[in-house]
Design a protein with these regions (language model features):
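Amphipathic alpha-helical segments that line or abut small-molecule/effector binding pockets
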Residues: 30, 96-114, 173, 198-209
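Helix-turn-helix
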Residues: 27, 35, 39-69, 73
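C-terminal peripheral helix-coil segments that are non-catalytic and often amphipathic
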Residues: 1-8, 147, 151-159, 184-248
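Short amphipathic alpha-helical elements of helix-turn-helix/winged-helix folds
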Residues: 31-35, 109, 178
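Short glycine/proline-centered loop/turn elements that form peptide/ligand docking sites
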Residues: 1-18, 34, 43-45, 53, ...
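Amphipathic alpha-helical packing segments from all-alpha helical-bundle domains
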Residues: 83, 130-161, 166-184
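Generic hydrophobic, amphipathic alpha-helix propensity
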Residues: 21-32, 49, 74-82, 86, ...
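Hydrophobic alpha-helical connector segments
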Residues: 73, 87-118, 122, 136-137
């Protein structure tokens, strides 16, 4: 999610004008991400982003009608990188298909990213505004993500990697509730919280393992990890489609 980690999605061939427009979009999104880290969502204006990107304010508005739309696109570009990281980790280590390990690794990766950290953990105003914007514009992407998570959990249940004393829906809700709680608490300096982010991530995994995994869980196979990785890889196509739909 860091600067230039997610260049604007391109299709070949491109005209010179189209290539120039996409390069300009890259600069705008990089600038918005940098300013978000430095100043926070409330202080950043479209004019600030334009100045940082070296273009006119009107040019930014050609691509993004509102500040919320701009930062939602920053989030969307970052989300593509997040999903890509999940896929890579699953292919490198089959244990990453387990909800606790997957969430632990994601937590550590996002905390280490200077742009993702304020979006996911710190800037409540930004999250609130983007949630409202996303409700109106990212419905299909959200629905696909939920469908994918359910398929992921069903594969794990079929392989004996998740307990079956709770319904799949209950387990999915539990994952979301535990994850949201840990992420929300990152905005507070609780005296009981471990100082090391890795230790906080380990506690998140501990909670999910205790709640979701059977005591006699087998080891996830490479074959299963590839099937689950392909599920998440398919989400990247949906992200790309949403990108092309919303970016002018």
């Amino acid at each position: 999610v860091t600067e230039n980690a997610n260049p604007v999605i391109r299709s070949e061939p491109e005209s010179d004008a189209a290539a120039e427009s996409l390069e300009r979009l890259d600069r705008v999104l990089d600038a918005a991400g940098e300013l978000l880290v430095r100043w926070g969502y409330r202080r950043v204006t479209i004019e600030d982003v334009a100045d940082r990107a070296g273009i006119g304010k009107g040019t930014v508005y050609l691509h993004f009608p509102t500040k919320e739309a701009l930062f939602l696109t920053v989030l969307l570009r970052g989300y593509r990188s997040v999903v890509g990281g999940i896929v890579e980790r699953m292919r490198a280590d089959p244990l990453e298909v387990l909800p606790g390990r997957m969430t632990r690794s994601l937590f550590v990766a996002l905390l280490a990213d200077p742009v993702a950290r304020p979006i996911y953990f710190g800037d409540t105003e930004l999250l609130g505004r983007l949630a409202k914007e996303a409700t109106n514009t990212l419905g299909p992407l959200r629905e696909r993500g939920q469908e994918l998570n359910r398929s992921h959990f069903q594969l794990l249940r079929d392989a004996g990697l998740l307990r079956t004393d709770r319904t799949l829906a209950e387990q999915h809700y539990l994952l979301q509730a535990v994850g949201a709680g840990f992420w929300f608490l990152e905005g507070f300096e609780l005296p009981s919280a471990p100082a090391d982010p890795a230790a906080r991530a380990e506690l998140q995994e501990y909670a999910l393992v205790a709640a979701l995994e059977p005591a006699d869980r087998p080891e996830p196979t490479v074959e299963l990890a590839e099937v689950v990785a392909r599920l998440y890889e398919s989400l990247i196509d949906v992200i790309d489609e949403e990108w092309r739909r919303r970016v002018r």
